[in-house]
UniProtKB/Swiss-Prot annotation:
BP GO annotations: translation
InterPro entries: Ribosomal_bL9 (IPR000244), Ribosomal_bL9/RNase_H1_N (IPR009027), Ribosomal_bL9_bac/chp (IPR020594), Ribosomal_bL9_C (IPR020069), Ribosomal_bL9_C_sf (IPR036791), Ribosomal_bL9_N (IPR020070), Ribosomal_bL9_N_sf (IPR036935)
Taxonomic superkingdom: Bacteria
Protein name per UniProt: Large ribosomal subunit protein bL9
Recorded family membership: Belongs to the bacterial ribosomal protein bL9 family.
Lineage: Bacteria, Bacillati, Bacillota, Bacilli, Bacillales
Species this protein is from: Bacillus velezensis (strain DSM 23117 / BGSC 10A6 / LMG 26770 / FZB42) (Bacillus amyloliquefaciens subsp. plantarum)
UniProt GO cellular component terms: ribonucleoprotein complex; ribosome
GO MF annotations in UniProt: rRNA binding; structural constituent of ribosome
Keywords: Ribonucleoprotein, Ribosomal protein, RNA-binding, rRNA-binding
Role played: Binds to the 23S rRNA.
Length: 149
């Protein structure tokens, strides 16, 4: 019997996949527990519609990421921190501080985990911070750390 999986079933199929399984397994387990539905014309057309919708959403998300990349690459985030001799900071500027400053000054919300900053910024001046907006889109944000008065 052909079924369309509504959820991932370990060893059998992934969500949205159409597969042939034993009749008893389909009726007594998959359909009964709501893990799959019978693959009839109505359900197949609904699956196609859902896949098209997901594809459109993925394209829209990619476009939003590209637009955000354009915006971020034109901005400079300015932060101030206490520093000692030679421009070394006491502590460091973290991705959390950068994300908060970006939200406060430019009204752009970016998750701190998307800022790919290894150890934090430990010196005064300009630093380019990579921002992973989407698996296919990466922007570079310019961060200026100046001395706190």
């Amino acid at each position: 019997m052909k079924v369309i999986f509504l959820q991932d079933v370990k060893g059998k199929g992934k969500k949205g996949e159409m597969k042939n399984v034993a009749d008893g397994y389909a009726h007594n387990f998959l359909i009964k527990k709501g893990l799959a539905v019978e693959a009839n014309a109505t359900n197949i057309s609904a699956l196609k519609g859902q896949k098209e919708k997901e594809k459109k959403e993925a394209i829209a998300e990619l476009e939003r990421a590209k637009d955000l990349k354009e915006t971020l690459e034109q901005l400079t985030v300015e932060l101030s921190a206490k520093s000692g001799e030679g421009g070394r900071l006491f502590g460091s500027v973290t991705s959390k501080q950068i994300a908060e400053a970006l939200q406060k000054t430019h009204k752009i919300k970016v998750d701190k985990r998307k800022l790919e900053l290894q150890d934090g910024i430990r010196t005064l001046g300009y630093t380019n911070v990579p921002v992973k907006l989407h698996p296919e889109v990466q922007a570079v944000l310019k961060v200026h750390v100046k001395e706190e008065a």
